Amino acid sequence: MACSIVQFCYFQDLQAARDFLFPHLREEILSGALRRDPSKSTDWEDDGWGAWEENEPQEPEEEGNTCKTQKTSWLQDCVLSLSPTNDLMVIAREQKAVFLVPKWKYSDKGKEEMQFAVGWSGSLNVEEGECVTSALCIPLASQKRSSTGRPDWTCIVVGFTSGYVRFYTENGVLLLAQLLNEDPVLQLKCRTYEIPRHPGVTEQNEELSILYPAAIVTIDGFSLFQSLRACRNQVAKAAASGNENIQPPPLAYKKWGLQDIDTIIDHASVGIMTLSPFDQMKTASNIGGFNAAIKNSPPAMSQYITVGSNPFTGFFYALEGSTQPLLSHVALAVASKLTSALFNAASGWLGWKSKHEEEAVQKQKPKVEPATPLAVRFGLPDSRRHGESICLSPCNTLAAVTDDFGRVILLDVARGIAIRMWKGYRDAQIGWIQTVEDLHERVPEKADFSPFGNSQGPSRVAQFLVIYAPRRGILEVWSTQQGPRVGAFNVGKHCRLLYPGYKIMGLNNVTSQSWQPQTYQICLVDPVSGSVKTVNVPFHLALSDKKSERAKDMHLVKKLAALLKTKSPNLDLVETEIKELILDIKYPATKKQALESILASERLPFSCLRNITQTLMDTLKSQELESVDEGLLQFCANKLKLLQLYESVSQLNSLDFHLDTPFSDNDLALLLRLDEKELLKLQALLEKYKQENTRTNVRFSDDKDGVLPVKTFLEYLEYEKDVLNIKKISEEEYVALGSFFFWKCLHGESSTEDMCHTLESAGLSPQLLLSLLLSVWLSKEKDILDKPQSICCLHTMLSLLSKMKVAIDETWDSQSVSPWWQQMRTACIQSENNGAALLSAHVGHSVAAQISNNMTEKKFSQTVLGADSEALTDSWEALSLDTEYWKLLLKQLEDCLILQTLLHSKGNTQTSKVSSLQAEPLPRLSVKKLLEGGKGGIADSVAKWIFKQDFSPEVLKLANEERDAENPDEPKEGVNRSFLEVSEMEMDLGAIPDLLHLAYEQFPCSLELDVLHAHCCWEYVVQWNKDPEEARFFVRSIEHLKQIFNAHVQNGIALMMWNTFLVKRFSAATYLMDKVGKSPKDRLCRRDVGMSDTAMTSFLGSCLDLLQILMEADVSRDEIQVPVLDTEDAWLSVEGPISIVELALEQKHIHYPLVEHHSILCSILYAVMRFSLKTVKPLSLFDSKGKNAFFKDLTSIQLLPSGEMDPNFISVRQQFLLKVVSAAVQAQHSATKVKDPTEEATPTPFGKDQDWPALAVDLAHHLQVSEDVVRRHYVGELYNYGVDHLGEEAILQVHDKEVLASQLLVLTGQRLAHALLHTQTKEGMELLARLPPTLCTWLKAMDPQDLQNTEVPIATTAKLVNKVIELLPEKHGQYGLALHLIEAVEAISLPSL
């Protein structure tokens, strides 16, 4: 309870505000960074402050010091103001200003804290050369009745060197501007309404006072409040509509010309005061002499105090009623950001007509009223001393003044004299703190001797002066008037102390009573740490040291704290000393604080704590009842009860207790009311769960379950009206407390009955004990599964708890749900430890059935007394609503356990690369999560597991087919070609197929194969969208999409994928490729599409597959019925988001021609990227209709190209398709020369490559290009690359054989020309001489350089010539040439035979 400094707010980015106000500092930093290392980045936002300060000592010392001072002391050169409600802070310098607003944000440590963030920044000057001299943030009260006490809004008042005072909103919108004097504004101060503390204090009016070099203007607070509200409403209306004209009320102000004083620096407006009769006579004698007349009633006067020079402090008194207040017509100013309509509205307020007249009036300065002269009545003359600032105390009785001699002087305002002086405070900043006494903290024994008579008397008020000495970096708190220093803090040399001296404007004696706004009297802004702090001063520090019992008590508390920290071997001595100290403390609140600190000590043993608390309790009981504080007595009694409970539980846990009864499976079956088959099934499930649930728990050797320090025990529990409750503690702490009570009992090492009796008698409710028991059981799953005997202990414990009073209501009916069992079921539903939850549910069901049977037996026996009735056996179970709920829960937990076991299982497949997305751990399941996950929640969790394991879709299909297989070999017949991959993996899958099969059986509806494939497809595409570089995810997604059998589901999923993830990237890729006119480079792909060039190639290929699937699904969906989505009986109550499959079924039908149109574009893009084609602009292959239809909703009907296409388009398209065919043949057969089968083709990075020639023919059909031209070109390219056997096959598909024969004839000529002319062998030359001249001439005209493969055997060429002869009709012009070629080829082949 000492004086403290508290941090309550931080700055989010104070550096940005500094750089805005001081641009030269940023430039210096930048130039300094460049001087140090030119290669480093010059971006000032990327460098931290530490980086700038790192190399400063290397610079010249003076320059370095100057730079450092500028960087840290910049706040001293700014005008600073903080709203007392902490809603707004203004930092201004010259023409610029930054408005900061508080926001709740999470810090780096995850703690929520308030941070000041920049709300607005800009220039405030209207006239050229004017600068800000003073600023105030005034919160204005809300006029609404339902207001909670927060201000409605905050007005920023700014004074300028031009004499203008301007008023702004929090967003920097200028509301109004007033020129009340033509000299610079020196200081703005505000006074708001305060309820008078007692009748002797004069009620003060609200006002805003403005100090000029030779005048003071005071604006009436009520008038200002009304004007500001009207202006703000007008700005809002004008911004919205622009045609509202309302004349705001005029401002009422008084203007006093201060005389007989040289210079004025600062002022304080004390307010209205009334002199006592003696002071009235004294003043009248001083002014009017011996014969002065005196009025019967003392006149009311407004008092002003100024500081400056000659006199150092001047006192002015203005008689109320001596002058009429002046009325200023409010010249509403409008910020340039608002619309021109707002300017029209403003002109309407002032009666302006035209724009020309408006400009003239704006340029002309308003009329300035003359000041009423006011002479200084008296002062403190000190010719050498110059005052710098004055700060009025909250009670208006004292004022603190600073001067240029480094002194702080305390003035008595009423008497006008200096009553105290502090030395050595140069450049001091001052403020006040007013503290009100808390009546509850008074000593009861002393209440009767108090001057107030009883503890219900009025609260006393204390005033403390706060002085910040920046030269020494110290903040001091002094008790006034003559009190000691009560607090001192080292805060740094570059802070600013802010003392507003006012609260909220617009309150009165009625509204201020209901308002209790959170206001800060004083704040310290620290720019170095970027924090805002306030000072808390307890009232008792104002009491004198010698007489203060509280000061003595605080001394004893400090002594006690020091004693608790010391390590003493003699604990008895320490205990005795602590007892003496706590009994010596007088105040009950302090005594309670001391006892709390003792009980929180870790060094004192339990016996010490018990003895000290018992001693204090005995002492309090021995005193008179009236003088004992009831709260302290109750506190002691409660702590003593807790200590006794701790002792009892510790003793029970330490006893050597063991259950010697043997425990068999048969006993367990009877206990859980299960038959042998059910028990074996349960054990098998739990065994699988244990094997797969391989989570490693970190355990330390000194960690012991069931042990809890007494300090922690006392922190967790509290008594409230004789009922023991648990405080709000974390889950781990809750488990620790439960372990302390029940862990030994669950292990059979402590008496269960004794423990239950002890806890019940201590006041713990059965519901609370059940909650603790279940928290322990469910959190210690690993230990419980390893020790089946603990099930018996849980059964015993649960039975005992259920038999306690108020556990199960006696009036409970079997047809209603028991809250007791519902509590247990809820805990099992919420638990993520499914093994422990399933076991506890079985135990709960067994105990519930036993109790229900007993109750039913009682009722039954009462009904049929005297009659022969069959004895009710344990095997018989009374039917009740609870029983049905238990059975449902057991089924749900069993399902959840199987699912969790599956999700924990891992295959040993060695994938080449594991993505970071796949490495993320899966969340653990609980029944609650599955019930809240919606209908698709189960399939979604399995899909996430499949993604993590990256299984092939065939694995899911294989596990599903095993469901109906008679033997293991049968399903393998139906698996398609990619089964080879599965069979290779199958050896490493382990138990996964069995677990999957079990999950399919358990969830026949939720894990139906189409549903699972749909969720897997969606999961893969979602993960791909997070990291588009992982193209294999998208490929896998398409694989799952292909596996979906139902066309309705397939269509919906594909359409959702396209709209959600693909169309934006697809359109970006299209526009990029169209812009560059070729296959774009990696950098451009990453910039525009967000993935690399190789990933984009795969992306386009997968998009093409997806569009093909969409079209196929649209065709086949009419033949297939819409699937009915069922849910398992146990999971009918699921709630939550709609499943992916349900969303898919809601999708509209696609417009088939539009999808086909997109697939054509996709094929073109894919070809360009796949073969790195150049000089291709994809969109240039389409007319305007075709271009406009792209990237529209695939379900919408668009205007598509129809009819005959422009021949120019067809020509361009044909060239493109021939390019694709050439590139495809080149990619496939360019490596045949090497004859390496592994390099036969260059497949796409992911998946199987397309059949490009067939795709090109298909595209030709859709693009209105002759398909035969493409086929002929394909044949020609095959022969060109020397793949004659494939060429012969391809010839069969060509229709116009004659044209093809002509093309092949040329190719044959090129081959012969290369063989005869370019090899230039002797035999070749001789043969050439024997050839007919026409053939010779034709061969010489051939260019063999066009041939891609010149090493074709002559026998193969001979076959080609024969093929040409077959294709050419005899009447063809080149038939004779072909016959000559046959002879030439035969002649060439003869020498080789």
Swiss-Prot record:
Position of the signal peptide: none
UniProt KW keywords: Cataract, Cytoplasm, Disease variant, Endoplasmic reticulum, GTPase activation, Intellectual disability, Phosphoprotein
GO cellular component: autophagosome; cytosol; endoplasmic reticulum membrane; plasma membrane; presynaptic membrane; protein-containing complex
Impact when changing R426C: In MARTS1; abolishes GEF activity towards RAB18
Cysteines joined through disulfide linkages: none
Region (Disordered): 36-67
Residues with Phosphoserine modification: S39, S450, S916, S978
Localization per record: Cytoplasm; Endoplasmic reticulum
Official protein name in the record: Rab3 GTPase-activating protein non-catalytic subunit
Native organism: Homo sapiens
Organism ancestry: Eukaryota, Metazoa, Chordata, Craniata, Vertebrata
Protein encoded by which gene: RAB3GAP2
